[in-house]
Amino acid sequence: MSSFQSTAAVRACARRAASTTSAATLASTTCRAAASRIQLQGQRSAGLVPKSWTRFSSSSIANDNQQKMLASHLQTADPVMYDIIEKEKQRQKQFINLIPSENFTSQAVLDALGSPMQNKYSEGYPGARYYGGNEFIDASERLCQDRALETFGLDPKEWGVNVQALSGAPANLYVYSALMDTHDRLMGLDLPHGGHLSHGYQTPTKKISFISKYFETLPYRLDEKTGYIDYNKLEELAITYRPKIIVAGASAYSRLIDYARLREICDKVNAYLMADMAHISGLVAAKVMPGPFTHADIVTTTSHKSLRGPRGAMIFFRRGVRRTNKKGEEELYNLETPINASVFPGHQGGPHNHTIAALAVALKQAQTPEFRAYQSQVLANATALAARLGEPKDKNGLGYTIVSGGTDNHLVLIDLKPQGIDGSRVERVLELVGVAANKNTVPGDKSALTPGGLRIGTPAMTTRGFTEEDFARVADIIDRAVTIAVRINKAAKEDAVKKGNEKAANRVKTFMDYLGNGETDPEIVQLRSEVESWVGTYPCPWDQSS
C-alpha cells in the first residue's frame, strides 16, 4: 500500500469513527488509533506537538498489532492453555475435594489476582520503596496489613505483620533466619506424627528439609497410645536440647494445640514460641477455635487453606515488652526489623502485589458473618465425618481407626493399617472415582512413600455447600473405595505371583499397574458415575452455570 493510500485509509477510518455513535465502532482499536493519529497530525501542523512525538505510520501499524495481541483473552491468545484450564475447572467441579489444605477461593479474590497490580515492581516496604510509582501499591499493602490485624483482633501497638512472604514454608524459613544463626536449635512436631516439612524434618539417614541442614532440629512427637502431643516428653527434650525456637503447628494433627503449655515450656528454656497456624487460620479468624496469639511470640500462616484467600502468607510478630529480667528491667521484643529484613532483602526481591491485593480482599471477607457461619459448618462437618467413619458398626459407624479418636478442627486422619491397606493405594482408587484425598503418615509408620494413613478435610466441600448429611455420604464413598482397593491389591499380588514375580507382589507399582485407569472395573466405573452426578450439582465460586 502506498503512503497516499495508507493516509487515505487512516482518514477514512477516522471519519467513520467520528460519524457514528456505534459503541462497537468507537471501540475499534484501529479506528481509535487512526483518529488519534489524525489529531496528532493536526497538532503537529499547528506547531503544538514536536515532530519527534508523533509515530510513523509503519511503526504505528506494528504497534497496533502488538496491542491487539496484548488485548486478546486467553481463549484467543493460547487455546492450548485455555483448554487445560477448562479441563481443570471441570475436574474441580466434578470431584469431591477432601484435601484439608485446599479450598475454593472467591470470585473477588480471583479478580484481584488477575488485576494489573501484578504489573508493578515494588522492592521494599510502604513508604520506602526502591522504585517510583508505588502510591497505590503502598495503599494496597497497608490496607492488607490493617485488615490482617483487624481480622485476628490484634492491637497494632502489640503486633505487627509482614504480608510479603510468598507462601508458608518460605515464611517459616524467613522467621528462622531472622532469629537464629546457622546451627542454632529448633524443635517442631515430627512429620510422621502430623508435623510439616518446614519445621525441620529429617530421617536418621537424610536431612529431607533444607531447614534441617541450615539449623539443628529435634522433633517432638505424639503419645502413640492417645494420638495427642506428648507435652511432658516435649518438655523433657526441650530442657535437655535448649532450642532457640519451638514451633507449635501441624499439617495433620486433628486436635487443639495447648499453646499455654508450650508457652510455659518456652519460658523455661528461654525459647521463642512460633505458631504455624497455616491450616487453622480461617477457624481462628472466625473465632470458632482458640488461636495462638495470646501465648506466641511469632505466628505464621498461609492464606489459601481455611482462610480461603490467595496463595500467600503472613508473618505476625510481637511488639513491646517481652519480659522482665531478674534485675526488674523490661526487655523489649526485637522481632520486627529482623523479620522484615529477612523477607526483604534477605530472601525475596519484589513482592507479588496482585497476591497482596487479593489477600486484602480475602481478609475483608473473613470479617463477615457469612465467613463465621462457614467456619462453624467446617467444624460441624468434620465432626460428622469423623463420627461416621470412626464409630463402631453397631452404632451406625464404619469402624475405622481415627488417629486420636476424633477431631477438634477441620481434618480427620484415618489409620488404614487395620484394613490391611495403605494410603497410597486408597488415594489412587479414590482419585479414579472422583475423590481427591491424600495419603499421610500416621504414628508407627516406617515409610513416607507407603504411609498407613489417609488425610481428609472439610473446608473445600463446605465452601461448595456440603453439610453433615453430605459428609456422612462421603464417609460411605471412602469405605467403598477402601473395599475396592483391598480387593484389587489382593488380585494384583496373586497376578504377580502367578507370573513368577513374587518379589514385586507387595510393591505399590505392581498395584498401580494392575489397576490402570480403572475403566475395566465395574465398581470403579459405577462409583465414579455416582460421584460425578452428585457433586456436579453443587456450585463452584467461579462457575456461573452452577
Swiss-Prot record:
The modification N6-(pyridoxal phosphate)lysine is found at K305. Its cofactor is pyridoxal 5'-phosphate. GO terms for molecular function: glycine hydroxymethyltransferase activity; pyridoxal phosphate binding. Keywords: Mitochondrion, One-carbon metabolism, Pyridoxal phosphate, Transferase, Transit peptide. Gene3D superfamilies: Aspartate Aminotransferase, domain 1, Type I PLP-dependent aspartate aminotransferase-like (Major domain). SUPFAM superfamilies: PLP-dependent transferases (SSF53383). It is an enzyme of class 2 (transferase). Residues 1-64 form a transit peptide. Transmembrane segments: none annotated. Pathway: One-carbon metabolism; tetrahydrofolate interconversion. Coiled coil: none annotated. The keyword Transit peptide applies. Interconversion of serine and glycine. Homotetramer. PANTHER family: SERINE HYDROXYMETHYLTRANSFERASE, SERINE HYDROXYMETHYLTRANSFERASE, MITOCHONDRIAL. This is Putative serine hydroxymethyltransferase, mitochondrial. It comes from Neurospora crassa (strain ATCC 24698 / 74-OR23-1A / CBS 708.71 / DSM 1257 / FGSC 987). The lineage of its organism: Eukaryota, Fungi, Dikarya, Ascomycota, Pezizomycotina. The gene is cbs-2.
